[in-house]
Curated annotation (Swiss-Prot):
Keyword Ribonucleoprotein belongs to the record: yes
Compositionally biased region (Basic and acidic residues): 89-99
Pfam family, one: Ribosomal_L19e
GO molecular function: large ribosomal subunit rRNA binding; structural constituent of ribosome
Biased composition (Basic residues): 59-85
Family to which the UniProt record says this protein belongs: Belongs to the eukaryotic ribosomal protein eL19 family.
Subunit: Part of the 50S ribosomal subunit.
PANTHER family: 60S RIBOSOMAL PROTEIN L19
Name under which the protein is recorded: Large ribosomal subunit protein eL19
Taxonomic source organism: Natronomonas pharaonis (strain ATCC 35678 / DSM 2160 / CIP 103997 / JCM 8858 / NBRC 14720 / NCIMB 2260 / Gabara)
Amino acid sequence: MTDLKAQKRLAADILDVGENRVRFDPDAQAEIADAITREDIRELIEDGTIEAKTAKGNSRGRARKRQQKRAYGHKKGHGSRKGRSGGRQNEKEDWQSRIRAQRRELRELRDAGDISREQYRELYDMASGGEFDSVADLNRYIDDKHGEQ
């Protein structure tokens, strides 16, 4: 068995693939052994004596199946989680959505005349300070404090 390492290295460089992907025709080993220049290797590639194996990829089938399950809300339990909760749900975005909802609710209440401008300003500042956890919490507070008036 002749040593074809040099030919394999040249062929890999010409084909722009790794050496493991270069395939020699087993019937033409003597012909390949005689090829010592890059031009000789190019001719053998054109003849089909030397060729590049197709690259193997990783199958995405299982990953697609898992993504489909997660779309339904499955496979999201505590055992599947890595990192802190803020890594899964951005805390800033969480805050933004909550404060926007609370401010929208306050605007609607003010425009409907359910709360005065002064009460609106007081509640707005409280919401900005993180006093309320949610719109429901805000409405509960309003019913308790301002519902009496």
